[in-house]
């Protein structure tokens, strides 16, 4: 395998994982902020706010795992000579 191709695949995979981690962290933080703000304003609505919060966090984390799959594709599916 050409070292340039291997280096590009590893750098690309690292950028994919870094971008996905940053995006997931920001998304989870925004969702958590909305949950805390909503519970602080209306404590009795806590039960109704948890379900959309966990759905949002689950979707954000699912997007991160899709990034993980693309990273594996780029890193492990590089052409081998």
Swiss-Prot record:
Recorded superkingdom: Bacteria
InterPro entries recorded: ATP_synth_csu_bac/chlpt, ATP_synth_F0_csu, ATP_synth_F0_csu_DDCD_BS, ATP_synth_F0_csu_sf, ATPase_proteolipid_c-like_dom, F/V-ATP_Csub_sf
Subcellular location: Cell membrane
Keyword annotations of the record: ATP synthesis, Cell membrane, CF(0), Hydrogen ion transport, Ion transport, Lipid-binding, Membrane, Transmembrane, Transmembrane helix, Transport
Keyword 4Fe-4S among UniProt keywords: no
Main location: membrane
Membrane-spanning ranges: 5-25, 57-77
GO function terms (MF aspect): lipid binding; proton-transporting ATP synthase activity, rotational mechanism
GO cellular component: plasma membrane; proton-transporting ATP synthase complex; proton-transporting two-sector ATPase complex, proton-transporting domain
Annotated SUPFAM superfamilies: F1F0 ATP synthase subunit C (SSF81333)
Membrane topology annotation: Multi-pass membrane protein
Residue(s) at site: Reversibly protonated during proton transport: 61
Role, per record: F(1)F(0) ATP synthase produces ATP from ADP in the presence of a proton or sodium gradient. F-type ATPases consist of two structural domains, F(1) containing the extramembraneous catalytic core and F(0) containing the membrane proton channel, linked together by a central stalk and a peripheral stalk. During catalysis, ATP synthesis in the catalytic domain of F(1) is coupled via a rotary mechanism of the central stalk subunits to proton translocation.
NCBIfam families on file: ATP_synt_c, PRK05880.1
Family: Belongs to the ATPase C chain family.
The protein, known as: ATP synthase subunit c
Organism the protein comes from: Mycobacterium marinum (strain ATCC BAA-535 / M)
């Amino acid at each position: 395998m050409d070292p340039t191709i291997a280096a590009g695949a590893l750098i690309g995979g690292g950028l994919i994982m870094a971008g996905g981690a940053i995006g997931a962290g920001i998304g989870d933080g925004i969702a958590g902020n909305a949950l805390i703000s909503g519970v602080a304003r209306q404590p009795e609505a806590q039960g109704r706010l948890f379900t959309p919060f966990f759905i949002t966090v689950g979707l954000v984390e699912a997007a991160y795992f899709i990034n993980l799959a693309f990273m594996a594709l780029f890193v492990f599916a590089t052409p081998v000579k």
